[in-house]
Every structure is written in structure tokens, then in C-alpha cells.
Amino acid sequence: MQNVLKSFLTPKNIQVQTISPCHFRILLEPLERGFGHTLGNALRRILLSSMPGAAIVQAEIDGVLHEYSSIEGVREDVVDVLLNLKGVAIKLEGREDAKLTLHKKGAGTVTAGDIQTESGVKIVNPDHVIAHITKDGEINMTLKAAMGRGYEPSSARSTGDQSRSVGLLLLDASYSPIRRVTYSVENARVEKRTDLDKLIIDLETDGTLDPEEAIRFAAAVLQHQLAAFVDLKQESDRDGGGKEGKVNPLLLRPVEDLELTVRAANCLKAESINYIGDLVQCTENDLLKTPNLGKKSLLEIKSVLAQKGLSLGMDLKGWPPADLTDQ
């Protein structure tokens, strides 16, 4: 069986073309015939549905009790303002949520750049229009941004009208930083073979996530999901233990073997996370609480672990082993 696996071609020519800062085109070749559509469709679906990101999830506007009303001195009604808030591209680093404020008075255009942010929060599209104020108008609002994945309707976060404060407006949240993904397959040639595939992925983001990083993360997610099928291990094995309680040797290796960036490695070392087994037991929230470890470093760690068939939040029974000593 191993000889058959080795006979499959793997992509050796990978090109990344930058169309714009938020638009990349990735070309992979050669692939066995049919694999272009197999991989292209899987990666596209993961990119569109499963990428983590941030979005504004709720708003409180002075003088507004519900979304079906208007704001004095503002051209748009509340529904339009909320729709425009959904278009704000926001990036949270090292935190799960953030409180934002917006205060503006006098005639003019209200843009995303008028939002006052906390540390670790960045507005990527400051020119995005939120509302227009007339001569004597004024707008004051308090916003909440949060991390998430995919799409979440406001009803999923509603705790009931009785416990919800008056004037708190919930927004449907589209957390995904991916704006558009398409793929196509063309013919590729290797020596005399002309029946091979070339996969072309066209990817656009909202600017909060680098397209190249996005495709790497999607590939890592796919690899991690398929890892269970490789050996068809029992659940206890996938949790880190073997059939006789043996520990996966990979978990005993130092974190340095993951070859993380200096920033990520130093953050883990400062928290006394010395072994890969220590790391995989941490959750995303645990790592985001680590000083100086941001979302980009978290994505890097998850991607590297996924490449090795591991993930964060694993339950390792009997960890650390009795014979494990600090190096």
C-alpha cells in the first residue's frame, strides 16, 4: 500500500500571485487527474464556512429603543445604520471581545475610522461609511465586537426579552474574513503525461486576514479532520494515549521542535509550556490570555499542530508521565 501512495504525484510547483493586498491567486501543480476538483472544492468550503474572525455583534445608540426607529439628525434609519456596522472590518489581537465607542456631532459622514478602539483592536477599513449626519445632528453609540467563526444570527445570542436591557440591539454576525473564493482546474503536464490537473484558487479577504495565511489554515483544518481516517485509531488513542496507556512520543518532544516563530515560542516558554503535551492541553482561550500572544500566533500554533495530527484542547489522561523530567 505504501508503494501505491508513493506513486501519486504531489504538487511541486506552488505559485502565489498578489493581485492586491486583499486578493491572492494560488496555483498548485501537478495533481493527479481529478484531484484538482477534490481539493479545490474542499478548501473552498472550509474557507467560506470555518475561518475565524471578528465582527460587531451588538450596539447601543443614544435615544434609540429598538431597530425600527430613526435617529434625529441622521439621514439613515436605525436598520440601515446596523447594516452598515456589519460591514466594518475589525481585527482583534489577543482578546475574545472588545468594547468600542463612537461619538460624532455636526454635519458630515460617519465612517468606521470614527470608532474609538481599545488596545489590541484595529479597524481595517476606516473609510467604510456608517451614516450621514445633517447640520444639527449627533450620534453616540457603544458597540461590542467579538471573535467567532462562520455566521451567527442574532437569535442565537439572544437570552430572552426579559433579561435583555432596553435599547440593546443585537446584530447578525458574519465573522468570516473571507469575502470571495473561487477555484478552477486547468490541464498540467509532467514529461509525457498531459492528463494532470493544475489547481487555481482565487481568494479575497476583508483585509483582517492575509490570504496566504488563510489558505494555510484551511489546509491545516482539512488535514486535521482527515487525520482520524489514516489509522482509524480508537478515541482513546486520538486523545494521546496508546492501547496500553502509552503516551504518543510526539507529545514528549519539546515545544521547540515545532519550529514556531520567536514571538510565539517565547510566549509559551514564559508560561512554562515546555512540551508539546503541555501545549495541546491548552484551549484557545488559555493561549489568548497569554501576554503578547495574539491571534496570528494562535493561528500559527493551531496550523503547526494540525500538520502533526494534533489540536488544542486535547484531554491527555495520565499527563505528565511519571518519568517525564524537565530538560
Curated annotation (Swiss-Prot):
GO BP terms in the entry: DNA-templated transcription
InterPro entries tied to this protein: DNA-dir_RNA_pol_insert, DNA-dir_RNA_pol_RpoA/D/Rpb3, DNA-dir_RpoA, RBP11-like, RNAP_asu_C, RNApol_insert_sf
Region (Alpha N-terminal domain (alpha-NTD)), start-end ranges: 1-233
SUPFAM superfamilies: C-terminal domain of RNA polymerase alpha subunit (SSF47789), Insert subdomain of RNA polymerase alpha subunit (SSF56553), RBP11-like subunits of RNA polymerase (SSF55257)
Family (UniProt): Belongs to the RNA polymerase alpha chain family.
HAMAP family, per database record: RNApol_bact_RpoA
Gene3D superfamilies hit by this protein: 5' to 3' exonuclease, C-terminal subdomain, DNA-directed RNA polymerase, insert domain, RNA polymerase, RBP11-like subunit
Residue ranges of the region described as Alpha C-terminal domain (alpha-CTD): 247-327
Ranges in coiled-coil conformation: none
Keyword Transferase: yes
Enzyme Commission number: 2.7.7.6
Function: DNA-dependent RNA polymerase catalyzes the transcription of DNA into RNA using the four ribonucleoside triphosphates as substrates.
Broad EC category: transferase
Catalysed reactions, as listed in the record: RNA(n) + a ribonucleoside 5'-triphosphate = RNA(n+1) + diphosphate
Protein's gene: rpoA
Protein name per Swiss-Prot or TrEMBL: DNA-directed RNA polymerase subunit alpha
Pfam families from the UniProt entry: RNA_pol_A_bac, RNA_pol_A_CTD, RNA_pol_L
Assembly description: Homodimer. The RNAP catalytic core consists of 2 alpha, 1 beta, 1 beta' and 1 omega subunit. When a sigma factor is associated with the core the holoenzyme is formed, which can initiate transcription.
Domain remarks: The N-terminal domain is essential for RNAP assembly and basal transcription, whereas the C-terminal domain is involved in interaction with transcriptional regulators and with upstream promoter elements.
GO CC terms of this entry: cytoplasm; DNA-directed RNA polymerase complex
GO molecular function: DNA binding; DNA-directed RNA polymerase activity; protein dimerization activity
Organism name: Coxiella burnetii (strain RSA 493 / Nine Mile phase I)
Keywords: DNA-directed RNA polymerase, Nucleotidyltransferase, Transcription, Transferase
Keyword Transferase among record annotations: yes
